[in-house]
Amino acid sequence: MLNLLLLLLLLALPAAPAWATGASAGAGPLAQRLDSWPQWQLPAPLPRPGRRDLEYPAWFAGQWQVNALDPEGVEPALHYVVRFRQNSRGAVVGDRAFNAAAVGRAVLGDALLAVQNDPANPNRQIARLSGDQQLESTVVGRRSASPNARTFLADELALQVLHGPGDPRVSRVETLSRYRQLGPNRIEAEQWQASYSSPAEGLAAAARRSWRGQLLLERLS
């Protein structure tokens, strides 16, 4: 379960009912990346985000009930609330700490104590876990695209460090998300994720584990 939390903490939200994969998802590097899943490798075609957050289409703004499913049936369905709001520049961004805490508590319950944003960097969050553990997650690569007015794709690579008793454990997690607006109050999505070894073992790496998820978002406000 902790590994699933590592995958989910970097997300603004999880995934939904599938539609056709492949180049039809949109032109460019993200479509090519999707075509190659699950045989992903690093380095990925993801520019460094600096200190800018991932910006979403305006139709994401608000609070949403999420129903997240594992199409393989390995993990139980998750139900939680996420929210997106305007930042100081007027762009719609995910409330990362709120959303990560919602996902984490749905997975781990009381084992997740708190999630905090780094006030100096919107791409860095710190989660406090039971057992004197702390998970630090920093987005180090990102690319997004809108093939049309109702579709949005985003790919993020996060560096994750789990601090606790013993030596820190370092890994990299990549999440490619594809969202489609079904109407003003519904969004469906699909996500593809892969985890990689620590950069200390080499910047180039093949995916060690892969996962795909589906989700449906229904507007609350």
Language model: regions and residue ranges:
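Glycine-rich, aromatic-bearing surface loops/beta-hairpins
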Residues: S137-S221
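Amphipathic/hydrophobic helical signal segments and adjacent flexible N-terminal regions
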Residues: P17-G109, S197-S221
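Serine/threonine-rich low-complexity intrinsically disordered regions
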Residues: M1-N3, P17, G28-P29, N99, ...
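Bacterial N-terminal signal peptides
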Residues: N3-P14
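Short acidic, glycine-rich loop/turn motifs
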Residues: A68-E72, L129-G131, Q160-H163, Q193-S195
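Residue-level marker of positions within ordered structural domains that often coincide
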Residues: M1, L69, P184
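Predominantly extracellular/secreted and cell-surface proteins with exposed
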Residues: R85-V161
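Short amphipathic alpha-helical surface micro-motifs
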Residues: P43-P49, Q134-S137, V170-R172
